[in-house]
Protein backbone atom coordinates (compact mmCIF):
# COMPACT_ATOMS: atom_id res chain seq x y z
CA UNK A 1 0.00 0.00 0.00
CA UNK A 2 1.15 3.53 -0.68
CA UNK A 3 2.25 5.55 2.35
CA UNK A 4 -0.92 7.56 2.66
CA UNK A 5 0.41 9.52 5.64
CA UNK A 6 3.09 11.10 3.47
CA UNK A 7 0.55 11.76 0.73
CA UNK A 8 -1.52 13.85 3.15
CA UNK A 9 1.28 16.33 3.81
CA UNK A 10 0.94 19.68 2.12
CA UNK A 11 -2.82 19.53 1.62
CA UNK A 12 -4.18 22.91 2.67
CA UNK A 13 -7.27 23.21 4.79
CA UNK A 14 -10.48 23.17 2.77
CA UNK A 15 -12.44 25.00 5.47
CA UNK A 16 -12.38 28.74 4.89
CA UNK A 17 -10.83 28.46 1.44
CA UNK A 18 -12.67 30.77 -0.94
CA UNK A 19 -12.85 28.12 -3.64
CA UNK A 20 -14.66 25.66 -1.37
CA UNK A 21 -16.72 27.98 0.85
CA UNK A 22 -19.96 27.25 -0.96
CA UNK A 23 -19.30 23.58 -1.67
CA UNK A 24 -21.78 21.16 -0.10
CA UNK A 25 -20.26 18.69 2.32
CA UNK A 26 -21.54 15.15 1.88
CA UNK A 27 -21.47 12.41 4.46
CA UNK A 28 -20.54 9.75 1.90
CA UNK A 29 -19.48 10.08 -1.74
CA UNK A 30 -19.73 6.93 -3.83
CA UNK A 31 -17.54 6.98 -6.92
CA UNK A 32 -19.17 4.95 -9.68
CA UNK A 33 -22.81 4.88 -10.73
CA UNK A 34 -22.97 1.24 -11.74
CA UNK A 35 -25.22 -1.31 -10.08
CA UNK A 36 -22.83 -1.98 -7.16
CA UNK A 37 -22.32 1.72 -6.39
CA UNK A 38 -26.04 2.41 -6.59
CA UNK A 39 -26.90 -0.59 -4.41
CA UNK A 40 -24.35 0.62 -1.85
CA UNK A 41 -25.82 4.12 -1.75
CA UNK A 42 -29.27 2.62 -1.35
CA UNK A 43 -28.15 0.40 1.53
CA UNK A 44 -26.49 3.31 3.36
CA UNK A 45 -29.67 5.38 3.14
CA UNK A 46 -31.90 2.46 4.00
CA UNK A 47 -30.02 2.13 7.29
CA UNK A 48 -29.76 5.88 7.91
CA UNK A 49 -31.97 8.19 5.79
CA UNK A 50 -30.35 11.22 7.45
CA UNK A 51 -27.10 10.66 5.55
CA UNK A 52 -26.38 13.03 2.69
CA UNK A 53 -25.10 10.77 -0.09
CA UNK A 54 -23.78 11.61 -3.54
CA UNK A 55 -23.13 9.19 -6.40
CA UNK A 56 -20.41 10.42 -8.79
CA UNK A 57 -20.73 8.94 -12.29
CA UNK A 58 -18.40 9.96 -15.11
CA UNK A 59 -20.86 9.17 -17.92
CA UNK A 60 -24.11 10.98 -18.79
CA UNK A 61 -26.26 8.15 -17.43
CA UNK A 62 -26.14 5.59 -14.64
CA UNK A 63 -25.10 1.96 -15.22
CA UNK A 64 -23.66 2.61 -18.69
CA UNK A 65 -21.10 -0.17 -18.94
CA UNK A 66 -20.82 -3.57 -17.22
CA UNK A 67 -24.10 -3.10 -15.37
CA UNK A 68 -26.05 -2.94 -18.63
CA UNK A 69 -23.74 -4.74 -21.08
CA UNK A 70 -24.21 -8.24 -19.71
CA UNK A 71 -26.30 -11.34 -20.34
CA UNK A 72 -28.96 -10.33 -17.80
CA UNK A 73 -28.87 -13.57 -15.82
CA UNK A 74 -29.80 -13.88 -12.16
CA UNK A 75 -27.22 -16.48 -11.17
CA UNK A 76 -27.85 -19.13 -8.54
CA UNK A 77 -24.35 -19.51 -7.03
CA UNK A 78 -23.41 -23.00 -8.20
CA UNK A 79 -20.02 -22.29 -9.74
CA UNK A 80 -18.09 -20.62 -6.97
CA UNK A 81 -15.71 -22.10 -4.43
CA UNK A 82 -17.58 -22.97 -1.22
CA UNK A 83 -16.83 -20.46 1.50
CA UNK A 84 -15.77 -17.74 -0.96
CA UNK A 85 -17.42 -14.35 -1.01
CA UNK A 86 -18.64 -15.06 -4.54
CA UNK A 87 -20.50 -18.15 -3.36
CA UNK A 88 -21.89 -16.53 -0.23
CA UNK A 89 -22.94 -13.25 -1.85
CA UNK A 90 -24.42 -14.82 -4.99
CA UNK A 91 -26.71 -17.20 -3.12
CA UNK A 92 -27.78 -14.45 -0.73
CA UNK A 93 -27.94 -11.81 -3.47
CA UNK A 94 -30.11 -13.91 -5.76
CA UNK A 95 -32.85 -14.15 -3.14
CA UNK A 96 -32.54 -10.45 -2.32
CA UNK A 97 -32.80 -9.58 -6.02
CA UNK A 98 -36.00 -11.59 -6.50
CA UNK A 99 -37.50 -10.08 -3.35
CA UNK A 100 -36.56 -6.57 -4.49
CA UNK A 101 -38.08 -7.08 -7.93
CA UNK A 102 -41.31 -8.38 -6.41
CA UNK A 103 -41.52 -5.38 -4.09
CA UNK A 104 -40.80 -2.87 -6.88
CA UNK A 105 -42.68 -4.44 -9.80
CA UNK A 106 -39.54 -5.06 -11.88
CA UNK A 107 -40.03 -7.62 -14.62
CA UNK A 108 -38.06 -10.88 -14.43
CA UNK A 109 -38.51 -14.52 -15.38
CA UNK A 110 -37.58 -17.63 -13.43
CA UNK A 111 -36.67 -19.60 -16.55
CA UNK A 112 -34.05 -21.86 -14.94
CA UNK A 113 -30.74 -23.13 -16.26
CA UNK A 114 -29.27 -26.40 -17.48
CA UNK A 115 -25.55 -27.12 -17.17
CA UNK A 116 -25.06 -29.87 -19.72
CA UNK A 117 -22.67 -32.79 -20.16
CA UNK A 118 -22.42 -33.95 -23.78
CA UNK A 119 -20.06 -36.90 -23.26
CA UNK A 120 -19.52 -39.57 -20.62
CA UNK A 121 -16.11 -38.17 -19.74
CA UNK A 122 -17.87 -35.12 -18.30
CA UNK A 123 -20.15 -37.01 -15.92
CA UNK A 124 -17.71 -36.91 -12.99
CA UNK A 125 -17.20 -33.15 -13.34
CA UNK A 126 -20.97 -32.69 -13.55
CA UNK A 127 -21.48 -34.63 -10.31
CA UNK A 128 -18.75 -32.62 -8.57
CA UNK A 129 -20.39 -29.38 -9.67
CA UNK A 130 -23.75 -30.65 -8.42
CA UNK A 131 -22.21 -31.36 -5.00
CA UNK A 132 -20.71 -27.86 -4.99
CA UNK A 133 -24.16 -26.43 -5.66
CA UNK A 134 -25.57 -28.38 -2.72
CA UNK A 135 -22.74 -27.12 -0.50
CA UNK A 136 -23.36 -23.53 -1.62
CA UNK A 137 -27.04 -23.77 -0.75
CA UNK A 138 -28.42 -23.44 -4.29
CA UNK A 139 -32.19 -23.95 -3.91
CA UNK A 140 -34.04 -26.82 -5.61
CA UNK A 141 -31.00 -27.97 -7.57
CA UNK A 142 -31.42 -31.31 -9.34
CA UNK A 143 -29.11 -33.74 -11.15
CA UNK A 144 -30.76 -35.02 -14.34
CA UNK A 145 -29.27 -38.44 -15.02
CA UNK A 146 -31.06 -39.23 -18.27
CA UNK A 147 -31.39 -37.59 -21.64
CA UNK A 148 -35.17 -37.82 -21.34
CA UNK A 149 -35.16 -35.66 -18.21
CA UNK A 150 -32.99 -33.09 -19.95
CA UNK A 151 -35.19 -32.98 -23.06
CA UNK A 152 -38.30 -32.49 -20.95
CA UNK A 153 -36.87 -29.08 -19.99
CA UNK A 154 -35.01 -28.11 -23.19
CA UNK A 155 -36.45 -30.20 -26.08
CA UNK A 156 -33.92 -29.01 -28.65
CA UNK A 157 -30.74 -29.65 -26.65
CA UNK A 158 -30.55 -33.14 -28.11
CA UNK A 159 -26.78 -33.39 -27.86
CA UNK A 160 -26.89 -33.45 -24.07
CA UNK A 161 -26.66 -36.67 -22.06
CA UNK A 162 -26.98 -35.44 -18.48
CA UNK A 163 -27.42 -32.07 -16.83
CA UNK A 164 -27.79 -30.08 -13.66
CA UNK A 165 -31.03 -28.13 -13.42
CA UNK A 166 -31.10 -24.94 -11.34
CA UNK A 167 -34.67 -23.62 -11.43
CA UNK A 168 -33.73 -20.58 -9.31
CA UNK A 169 -31.72 -19.09 -12.20
CA UNK A 170 -33.57 -16.23 -13.86
CA UNK A 171 -33.32 -13.40 -16.36
CA UNK A 172 -33.74 -9.66 -15.89
CA UNK A 173 -32.75 -6.26 -17.27
CA UNK A 174 -30.14 -4.94 -14.84
CA UNK A 175 -30.39 -1.46 -16.32
CA UNK A 176 -33.96 -1.30 -15.00
CA UNK A 177 -32.79 -2.55 -11.61
CA UNK A 178 -30.08 0.13 -11.56
CA UNK A 179 -32.61 2.86 -12.36
CA UNK A 180 -34.77 1.65 -9.48
CA UNK A 181 -31.78 1.74 -7.10
CA UNK A 182 -31.12 5.30 -8.27
CA UNK A 183 -34.70 6.28 -7.52
CA UNK A 184 -34.36 4.77 -4.04
CA UNK A 185 -31.38 7.07 -3.46
CA UNK A 186 -32.92 10.32 -4.69
CA UNK A 187 -36.55 9.74 -3.73
CA UNK A 188 -37.47 6.78 -1.52
CA UNK A 189 -34.72 6.90 1.12
CA UNK A 190 -32.65 10.00 0.36
CA UNK A 191 -35.16 12.71 -0.55
CA UNK A 192 -35.19 14.41 2.86
CA UNK A 193 -31.39 14.40 3.12
CA UNK A 194 -31.13 15.74 -0.45
CA UNK A 195 -28.99 12.84 -1.58
CA UNK A 196 -28.22 13.02 -5.26
CA UNK A 197 -26.59 11.52 -8.34
CA UNK A 198 -24.06 13.68 -10.20
CA UNK A 199 -23.54 12.66 -13.83
CA UNK A 200 -20.59 13.70 -16.02
CA UNK A 201 -18.38 13.80 -12.91
CA UNK A 202 -15.12 12.02 -13.73
CA UNK A 203 -13.37 11.72 -10.37
CA UNK A 204 -9.64 12.05 -11.05
CA UNK A 205 -8.16 13.72 -8.00
CA UNK A 206 -8.51 12.85 -4.31
CA UNK A 207 -7.05 14.95 -1.48
CA UNK A 208 -7.65 14.19 2.18
CA UNK A 209 -7.09 16.76 4.92
CA UNK A 210 -6.71 15.07 8.28
CA UNK A 211 -7.35 18.30 10.21
CA UNK A 212 -10.65 19.04 8.47
CA UNK A 213 -11.35 15.30 8.26
CA UNK A 214 -12.64 15.97 4.76
CA UNK A 215 -11.86 14.46 1.39
CA UNK A 216 -11.81 16.66 -1.70
CA UNK A 217 -12.79 14.81 -4.88
CA UNK A 218 -12.39 16.71 -8.13
CA UNK A 219 -12.50 16.17 -11.87
CA UNK A 220 -9.15 17.79 -12.71
CA UNK A 221 -5.48 17.03 -12.26
CA UNK A 222 -3.18 18.79 -9.77
CA UNK A 223 -2.02 21.38 -12.29
CA UNK A 224 -5.53 22.26 -13.52
CA UNK A 225 -7.25 25.47 -12.46
CA UNK A 226 -9.28 24.49 -9.39
CA UNK A 227 -11.97 27.04 -10.19
CA UNK A 228 -12.58 25.34 -13.56
CA UNK A 229 -13.07 21.88 -12.04
CA UNK A 230 -16.07 20.16 -10.59
CA UNK A 231 -15.37 19.23 -6.99
CA UNK A 232 -17.12 18.05 -3.85
CA UNK A 233 -16.19 17.61 -0.21
CA UNK A 234 -17.07 14.48 1.71
CA UNK A 235 -16.43 12.91 5.09
CA UNK A 236 -16.17 9.39 3.67
CA UNK A 237 -15.90 7.77 0.26
CA UNK A 238 -16.60 4.36 -1.25
CA UNK A 239 -15.13 3.68 -4.69
CA UNK A 240 -17.05 1.27 -6.91
CA UNK A 241 -15.03 2.03 -10.03
CA UNK A 242 -15.63 -1.19 -11.95
CA UNK A 243 -13.44 -1.20 -15.04
CA UNK A 244 -11.39 1.72 -13.68
CA UNK A 245 -11.05 0.55 -10.09
CA UNK A 246 -7.27 0.10 -10.40
CA UNK A 247 -6.73 3.58 -11.84
CA UNK A 248 -8.83 5.28 -9.20
CA UNK A 249 -7.04 3.37 -6.44
CA UNK A 250 -3.69 4.72 -7.64
CA UNK A 251 -4.82 8.34 -7.17
CA UNK A 252 -6.97 7.69 -4.10
CA UNK A 253 -4.67 6.14 -1.51
CA UNK A 254 -5.26 2.52 -2.60
CA UNK A 255 -3.02 -0.47 -3.23
CA UNK A 256 -1.15 -0.89 -6.51
CA UNK A 257 -2.58 -4.37 -7.04
CA UNK A 258 -4.57 -5.91 -8.52
CA UNK A 259 -4.64 -4.39 -11.99
CA UNK A 260 -7.60 -4.66 -14.34
CA UNK A 261 -7.47 -6.37 -17.73
CA UNK A 262 -10.53 -5.87 -19.99
CA UNK A 263 -12.01 -8.78 -21.93
CA UNK A 264 -14.63 -8.08 -24.58
CA UNK A 265 -17.31 -10.69 -25.09
CA UNK A 266 -19.43 -10.80 -28.25
CA UNK A 267 -22.75 -12.56 -28.70
CA UNK A 268 -24.63 -14.01 -31.63
CA UNK A 269 -28.39 -14.30 -31.39
CA UNK A 270 -31.10 -16.43 -32.92
CA UNK A 271 -33.16 -14.80 -35.62
CA UNK A 272 -36.73 -14.29 -34.32
CA UNK A 273 -38.11 -17.39 -36.05
CA UNK A 274 -35.64 -19.63 -34.17
CA UNK A 275 -35.99 -18.22 -30.66
CA UNK A 276 -38.38 -21.02 -29.67
CA UNK A 277 -35.44 -23.45 -29.72
CA UNK A 278 -34.34 -22.32 -26.24
CA UNK A 279 -36.67 -22.10 -23.23
CA UNK A 280 -34.24 -20.84 -20.59
CA UNK A 281 -30.46 -20.86 -20.13
CA UNK A 282 -28.15 -23.64 -21.32
CA UNK A 283 -24.52 -23.63 -20.18
CA UNK A 284 -21.52 -25.90 -20.72
CA UNK A 285 -19.46 -27.26 -17.87
CA UNK A 286 -16.99 -24.53 -16.89
CA UNK A 287 -13.33 -24.59 -17.85
CA UNK A 288 -11.45 -24.72 -14.56
CA UNK A 289 -8.57 -22.66 -16.01
CA UNK A 290 -10.67 -19.54 -16.58
CA UNK A 291 -13.21 -17.53 -14.58
CA UNK A 292 -15.52 -17.24 -17.61
CA UNK A 293 -18.49 -19.57 -18.01
CA UNK A 294 -17.99 -20.47 -21.67
CA UNK A 295 -20.20 -19.98 -24.71
CA UNK A 296 -23.83 -20.62 -23.78
CA UNK A 297 -27.46 -20.09 -24.79
CA UNK A 298 -29.15 -17.27 -22.86
CA UNK A 299 -32.78 -16.28 -23.04
CA UNK A 300 -33.27 -12.53 -22.60
CA UNK A 301 -36.08 -10.76 -20.79
CA UNK A 302 -37.08 -9.08 -24.08
CA UNK A 303 -37.52 -12.46 -25.79
CA UNK A 304 -34.19 -12.55 -27.62
CA UNK A 305 -31.91 -15.58 -27.30
CA UNK A 306 -28.20 -14.80 -27.18
CA UNK A 307 -25.38 -17.24 -27.88
CA UNK A 308 -21.98 -16.52 -26.39
CA UNK A 309 -19.96 -14.77 -25.26
CA UNK A 310 -16.38 -15.37 -26.25
CA UNK A 311 -13.59 -13.65 -24.31
CA UNK A 312 -11.15 -11.49 -26.27
CA UNK A 313 -8.56 -9.11 -24.85
CA UNK A 314 -9.90 -5.59 -25.40
CA UNK A 315 -7.77 -2.60 -26.36
CA UNK A 316 -10.48 -0.25 -25.13
CA UNK A 317 -11.92 -0.65 -21.63
CA UNK A 318 -15.20 0.82 -22.79
CA UNK A 319 -15.17 -0.28 -26.43
CA UNK A 320 -17.78 -2.75 -27.60
CA UNK A 321 -16.70 -3.26 -31.21
CA UNK A 322 -13.83 -5.32 -32.64
CA UNK A 323 -12.26 -2.16 -34.07
CA UNK A 324 -12.42 -0.03 -30.90
CA UNK A 325 -9.02 1.16 -29.72
CA UNK A 326 -7.89 3.42 -26.88
CA UNK A 327 -4.22 4.38 -26.67
CA UNK A 328 -4.19 4.86 -22.88
CA UNK A 329 -5.82 1.46 -22.32
CA UNK A 330 -3.46 -0.23 -24.77
CA UNK A 331 -0.36 1.24 -23.13
CA UNK A 332 -1.61 -0.03 -19.77
CA UNK A 333 -1.93 -3.52 -21.25
CA UNK A 334 1.58 -3.41 -22.71
CA UNK A 335 3.02 -2.28 -19.36
CA UNK A 336 1.17 -4.96 -17.37
CA UNK A 337 3.65 -7.73 -16.41
CA UNK A 338 0.89 -10.04 -15.26
CA UNK A 339 -0.80 -9.98 -18.65
CA UNK A 340 2.32 -11.23 -20.43
CA UNK A 341 2.63 -14.12 -17.98
CA UNK A 342 -1.05 -14.96 -18.51
CA UNK A 343 -0.70 -14.77 -22.31
CA UNK A 344 2.33 -17.06 -22.24
CA UNK A 345 0.28 -19.75 -20.51
CA UNK A 346 -2.91 -19.41 -22.56
CA UNK A 347 -2.00 -17.97 -25.98
CA UNK A 348 -3.64 -20.83 -27.91
CA UNK A 349 -6.92 -20.30 -26.08
CA UNK A 350 -6.70 -16.57 -26.79
CA UNK A 351 -6.18 -17.09 -30.52
CA UNK A 352 -9.21 -19.37 -30.67
CA UNK A 353 -11.37 -16.78 -28.96
CA UNK A 354 -10.14 -14.09 -31.35
CA UNK A 355 -10.96 -16.22 -34.41
CA UNK A 356 -14.46 -16.84 -33.11
CA UNK A 357 -14.93 -13.10 -32.85
CA UNK A 358 -15.31 -12.67 -36.60
CA UNK A 359 -16.16 -16.19 -37.80
CA UNK A 360 -19.72 -17.34 -37.04
CA UNK A 361 -19.10 -20.88 -38.24
CA UNK A 362 -16.16 -21.31 -35.89
CA UNK A 363 -18.20 -19.72 -33.09
CA UNK A 364 -21.06 -22.20 -33.37
CA UNK A 365 -18.72 -25.20 -33.28
CA UNK A 366 -18.78 -24.73 -29.51
CA UNK A 367 -22.60 -24.92 -29.55
CA UNK A 368 -23.08 -27.88 -31.90
CA UNK A 369 -22.35 -30.49 -29.19
CA UNK A 370 -25.51 -29.24 -27.45
CA UNK A 371 -27.65 -28.48 -30.51
CA UNK A 372 -26.19 -30.48 -33.43
CA UNK A 373 -28.59 -29.03 -36.00
CA UNK A 374 -27.70 -25.38 -35.38
CA UNK A 375 -26.50 -23.52 -38.50
CA UNK A 376 -25.10 -20.10 -39.26
CA UNK A 377 -28.27 -19.25 -41.20
CA UNK A 378 -30.23 -19.27 -37.94
CA UNK A 379 -28.07 -16.55 -36.41
CA UNK A 380 -27.30 -12.85 -36.53
CA UNK A 381 -24.92 -10.67 -34.58
CA UNK A 382 -26.08 -9.66 -31.10
CA UNK A 383 -24.72 -7.47 -28.35
CA UNK A 384 -21.36 -7.28 -26.65
CA UNK A 385 -19.86 -6.33 -23.32
CA UNK A 386 -16.50 -5.73 -21.68
CA UNK A 387 -15.67 -7.55 -18.46
CA UNK A 388 -13.12 -6.27 -15.97
CA UNK A 389 -10.81 -9.05 -14.85
CA UNK A 390 -8.47 -8.46 -11.94
CA UNK A 391 -5.01 -9.92 -12.41
CA UNK A 392 -1.93 -10.15 -10.18
CA UNK A 393 1.64 -9.31 -11.19
CA UNK A 394 2.33 -13.05 -11.37
CA UNK A 395 -0.34 -13.47 -14.04
CA UNK A 396 -2.96 -15.13 -11.87
CA UNK A 397 -6.61 -14.35 -12.53
CA UNK A 398 -8.27 -13.17 -9.31
CA UNK A 399 -11.72 -14.66 -8.98
CA UNK A 400 -13.12 -13.39 -5.67
CA UNK A 401 -14.28 -9.98 -4.51
CA UNK A 402 -11.59 -7.70 -3.06
CA UNK A 403 -12.12 -4.71 -0.76
CA UNK A 404 -9.19 -2.35 -0.13
CA UNK A 405 -9.30 -0.19 3.01
CA UNK A 406 -6.44 2.35 3.41
CA UNK A 407 -5.58 2.84 7.08
CA UNK A 408 -5.17 6.64 7.17
CA UNK A 409 -7.94 7.79 4.83
CA UNK A 410 -11.69 7.10 5.13
CA UNK A 411 -12.04 5.36 1.76
CA UNK A 412 -13.14 1.86 0.79
CA UNK A 413 -12.14 0.59 -2.65
CA UNK A 414 -14.09 -2.22 -4.30
CA UNK A 415 -11.15 -3.57 -6.29
CA UNK A 416 -12.65 -6.65 -7.91
CA UNK A 417 -16.34 -7.25 -8.48
CA UNK A 418 -16.58 -9.96 -11.13
CA UNK A 419 -19.67 -11.81 -12.28
CA UNK A 420 -22.03 -12.46 -10.54
CA UNK A 421 -21.74 -8.89 -9.19
CA UNK A 422 -25.05 -7.77 -10.71
CA UNK A 423 -26.90 -10.73 -9.19
CA UNK A 424 -25.09 -10.17 -5.89
CA UNK A 425 -25.34 -6.36 -5.86
CA UNK A 426 -27.72 -6.07 -2.91
CA UNK A 427 -25.68 -8.56 -0.88
CA UNK A 428 -22.41 -6.86 -1.87
CA UNK A 429 -23.91 -3.56 -0.70
CA UNK A 430 -24.66 -5.06 2.71
CA UNK A 431 -21.06 -6.32 2.91
CA UNK A 432 -19.65 -2.91 1.96
CA UNK A 433 -21.86 -0.94 4.35
CA UNK A 434 -21.02 -3.34 7.20
CA UNK A 435 -17.36 -2.68 6.41
CA UNK A 436 -17.98 1.07 6.30
CA UNK A 437 -19.71 1.07 9.67
CA UNK A 438 -16.72 -0.75 11.14
CA UNK A 439 -14.03 1.33 9.41
CA UNK A 440 -15.51 4.82 9.21
CA UNK A 441 -15.29 6.45 12.60
CA UNK A 442 -18.47 8.34 13.55
CA UNK A 443 -20.45 7.14 10.50
CA UNK A 444 -23.00 5.49 12.77
CA UNK A 445 -23.55 8.71 14.73
CA UNK A 446 -24.29 10.95 11.74
Swiss-Prot record:
Main localization category: mitochondrion
Lineage: superkingdom: Eukaryota
A Pfam family hit: DAO
Catalytic activity as recorded in UniProt: (S)-2-hydroxyglutarate + A = 2-oxoglutarate + AH2
Subcellular location: Mitochondrion
GO molecular function, one term: 2-hydroxyglutarate dehydrogenase activity
EC number of the protein: 1.1.99.2
Keywords: FAD, Flavoprotein, Mitochondrion, Oxidoreductase, Transit peptide
Gene3D superfamilies in alphabetical order: D-Amino Acid Oxidase, subunit A, domain 2, FAD/NAD(P)-binding domain
An example Gene Ontology CC term for this record: mitochondrion
Record-linked InterPro entries: FAD-dep_OxRdtase, FAD/NAD-bd_sf
Obligatory cofactor(s): FAD
Targeting signal (transit peptide) range: 1-28
Similarity comment: family membership: Belongs to the L2HGDH family.
Protein name, entry field: L-2-hydroxyglutarate dehydrogenase, mitochondrial
Organism: Dictyostelium discoideum
Annotated gene: l2hgdh
Amino acid sequence: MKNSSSMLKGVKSFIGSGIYTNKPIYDVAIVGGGIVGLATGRELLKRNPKLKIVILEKENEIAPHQSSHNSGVIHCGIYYKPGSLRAKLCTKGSKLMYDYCNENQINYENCGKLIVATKKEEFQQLEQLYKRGIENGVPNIKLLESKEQLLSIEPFINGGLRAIHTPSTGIIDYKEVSKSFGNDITEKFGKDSKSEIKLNFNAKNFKYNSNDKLLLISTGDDDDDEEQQQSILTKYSIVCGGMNSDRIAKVAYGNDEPSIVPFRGSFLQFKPEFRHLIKGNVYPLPNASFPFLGVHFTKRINGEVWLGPNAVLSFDREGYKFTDFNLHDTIDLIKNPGLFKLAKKHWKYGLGELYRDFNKDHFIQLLKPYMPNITVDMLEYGGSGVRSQAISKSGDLIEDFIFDTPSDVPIIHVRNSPSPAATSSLAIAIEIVDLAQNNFKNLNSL
